[in-house]
Curated annotation (Swiss-Prot):
This is Probable oligoribonuclease. The lineage of its organism: Eukaryota, Fungi, Dikarya, Ascomycota, Taphrinomycotina. One of its GO terms (biological process) is rRNA processing. It holds the Pfam family RNase_T. It is found in: Cytoplasm; Nucleus. The active site is at Y202. Keywords: Cytoplasm, Exonuclease, Hydrolase, Nuclease, Nucleus. PANTHER family: OLIGORIBONUCLEASE, MITOCHONDRIAL (PTHR11046:SF0).
Amino acid sequence: MQGAFLNNRIILQSYHIKKRLYSKRTSSLHSRFLQPTYRKNICQISKPIFQQDLSTNTNFISKLKSPFSNLKMSNLKQPLVWIDCEMTGLEVGKHVLMEVAAIITDGNLRPVEEKFDAVIKLDEKQLSEMNDWCIEQHGKSGLTERCRQSNLTVKDVENQLLAYIKKYIPKKREALIAGNSVHADVRFLSVEMPKIIEHLHYRIIDVSTIKELAKRWCPDIPAYDKKGDHRALSDILESIGELQHYRSYWLS
């Protein structure tokens, strides 16, 4: 009798273990089993929100058209400060910041009403340090000429950006920095705009890391289409859209 009881108990435990393992596996890899049409529709939910052409924006702090533009400061939970910089190159100390943009979102990627974008005044000596890629790309986008015409110093931009961040996130070390390969931006900001780095948390959310993990662990997830015009504000919008893309397919 006791043997039969133990045998039944073992069978029951085995059933529950298998059920747990199966449920966990199915949940974590649910995106692999979605029908192609359904998966496509999931991604389309977020793309129109952020894929806006803002490369011609000339305002320092301006409105961001979004279904979530009424997000209030009191509702900003787990805030993220999305930052993107354009530089004359990638060598800190030799190259300098050209443009800095930022958008603040909550933890669910809903942006606040305002966005930040500023171009820094550079002299010809600083511009002459650009490599061939930067000369071509920033010349084509019009950023080089805007740096010549700008009247904002790097300290002007630092103070204005800090004011923008503090308006929504007054507490230090609360908001994480987010972006694509944002560690490169952080290196330049640490030197040229240390007040920004001091106010934000040391942890970062790097969308490029998630992209690389998705390629290795869920290679069937389609790539996120990016315009890639290498202007700071439009790059941020694409980064937010890209993270929404991976969240919809994989991380939900």
